[in-house]
Every structure is written in structure tokens, then in C-alpha cells.
Amino acid sequence: MLSFVAQRIVKGAIVLLAIIVLNFFLIRLAPGDPAVVMAGEAGAGDQVFVTQLREKFGLDRPLPEQLFLYVKGILSLDLGFSFRQQTPVSKLIMDRLPATLLLTMTAFAISLLLGILLGTLAARWAGTWADTAITVLALVFYATPLFWIALMAILLFSVALDWLPSFGYETVGANYTGLAHMLDVGAHLIMPAMTIGLFFMATYARMTRASMLEVKRLDFVKTARAKGLSDNVIQRRHVLRNALLPVVTLAGLHSGTLIGGAVLTETVFAWPGIGRLMYEALLQRDYNLLLGVFVVCSAMVLIFNLVTDLVYRMVDPRIDFAA
């Protein structure tokens, strides 16, 4: 297993380097000049001041040299300075990362648990009204845009019913501590986490249902039933365990999409995570901050995929890492 993990880390480093190079040039070649944006905000749009800003931040250097200096900085865990906020990019990201991790991990748990539960029930009651209801529900959430789910949730639970706060990470000026603070954050977390969770739940429910129905037709399930095992035991020990492999694969593939969904959700709910930070950096043409967020998000996706491969081994012990 250690050799497998080491190989994946090396491959991940190569992929991460390719992502850095690609995004570096894409961001630099995009329309807009951060020096012009900063000069305009400072109220000094003359060309001399713009030139001084470009020299200060190294934007006047050739792109290959800028890339070399950036990669060299990453090797020492230095993501550079934010052009707009004049703060180390790593500090800005670390300040926002806990909020994003809390949101994405909660949403992932909701989507996976609800998806597997509903998919299992749909497979067990295949062909009945319950199966139809679950399938229709999954299709509705799957076909609805993420931002629309977020807006409808705000209108229903915040505006109409006044049950939940509509934006932010915590109540501004409340100064809660201990359990009260946890409950306050939890109340703010419910809507954004459920928005992402329900969107991805639909995919997991459909995949679980289809996979379980396929496994049910295999010979080893018929053998288990011939031995007199109860339906509950067959479903839990044999069908569900083997049906989870495609779901685990899909969960690994969705890691990048989950972070992408966080960008939209954090923007709608004003959730102070790195998704919203990415959106702000894009509007401000803050190259270093935008690229730093890309690097961190890419690293998170690679780590998540590695964890997915390890979970494979837990779900199916027959998988050999040395293969």
C-alpha cells in the first residue's frame, strides 16, 4: 500500500505541475490588466503609474520568467502576494479554507448518505410507486441548476418562513461562544450544505439504484438466497457492498465538481470560503490570488481521489494495489 500511495503522490505532483502551467498562461492571457485595475481604484490611471505597478509586481517580465519564479515560490510554499489586498495569498486562502471544507464535507456527507439511502430503497421497491417517486425526485434535483435551488431555498426558508438565516457564516455582531456559536454556524450552514447536497444526491441515488438492480441478478446473490439467508442480510452483506463500487468511483470524480458547486453556492449565500474568494479574485484580475486558489483546489481534488482509491480497498478487499 505504501508503494501505491507513493506512486500516486508522484503522479499527483506531475498533474499539479501541469495544472499550474496551464492555468498560469490561461490567466495571464485573459483580457484585463491588474495594474490598470489597481491604478483605477487608486484614482491614478496615468500610464506612468500603471508602468510602476507592473514593475513592482513583476508583470513586465516575460511570461516564462514569471512562471519560473512562481513555481520556485510554490516549492517553498510561497504562493505570492495578492495584488489587490497586499497580503500573502497563502494567508488569504487559509483564512477562508476552513469554511469551504466545512461546507463541502457536510454537503458531501449529505449527498452520499441520502443518495445511497434513497437508491437502496428504490432498488428494493423497484417497480412500485415508491421507486417512481424517488426516481422523479432525483431527476428533479438533477435537472435543476444549482443556483436556482439556492435561490428557492432562500425564498422559502428565509424569506417566507423565516426559519433560517439567508447569508453569511455566522450572525454579525452576535459574539456567540461555545455551544451557542456552534448552533449559530450550524443554522447558517444548513441551506448552503443542503443545496449542494441535494444536487449531488440525485446522481448517487440513481447510480445506487441501477448498480443494486444489476448486482441482484448475479449468481452469487441467487446462491445466497438459496442458502436461506434473509433479504435484509442479502441486501446489506452482498448486494449493497458490491453495488457501492461504482458509487465510490462517482464520488471521486465529483470532488472537483463539488468544489465548483461551492463557488456558486458561496456566492449566493455570501459564505466566506475560497469559492467566493476565487470569484472576487476573478473580478479584480488578481492573478496571484486566483492562481493560488486554483492550486489549492487542484491539490484538494488530487487528495480526495487518493482517498477514494483507498476507500476502494475497504469496500472490496479483492482489489490489489500492486496490480
Question: Which role fits each region the language model picked out?
Answer:
Residues 2-4, 93-130, 159-162, 173-323:
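Alpha-helical transmembrane segments of integral membrane proteins
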Residues 6-12:
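N-terminal signal-anchor/signal peptide hydrophobic helix marking the start
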Residues 9, 49, 53, 63-79, ...:
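Hydrophobic alpha-helical segments of integral membrane proteins
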Residues 12, 20, 43-44, 112, ...:
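Residue-level recognition of pore/gate-forming positions within transmembrane alpha-helices
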Residues 16-68, 161-182:
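Hydrophobic alpha-helical transmembrane segments of membrane transport/permease proteins
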Residues 22-29, 57-58, 70-72, 137-167, ...:
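Membrane-water interface segments at the C-terminal ends of transmembrane alpha-helices
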Residues 40-58, 135-144, 191-197, 233-250:
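Hydrophobic alpha-helical transmembrane segments
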Residues 59-116:
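An internal, D/E-rich "acidic patch" concept
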